[in-house]
């Protein structure tokens, strides 16, 4: 197992979701290239005393469903998803689909209906669970970055496996300054920007 994947799994479970004994964790992933990370997450969650569950997504299958879906169908899909989500304490999503434009030809009324009717599950997940969503490096992402997959993976793992708890502590002074600040003025060559950060 690539040690960078082990480190990323540790970060997602320990820092991002703070998985505890007994936590039910839904791992929701798309793309074959992230299976090693999914497997490592399962191992790590078990080691923490948690219970991993896995959903597998496929944008091509989702596209086919959405092209002819009905409101009744999506409403029921949301009821099932929401019931499952209400049983979870944490959610880890990994997105590594091969085609970022797979849903581009789904009619906007179908997509809007889907997003509107499934929003209760999203709202519950965001407000009631410990969660993290990340993209995972693949050929599609490397191509969008105009780089090789290997170079993109190196960049990705360097950025995604930083010591975020250390960064969090390092930002305490800035956060304290921002709490007592109203107006911010940024001035430089070609820039003169003033704005409020109050509330």
Regions found by a protein language model. Name each.
Residues 1-199:
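Active-site bordering "gate/hinge" segments
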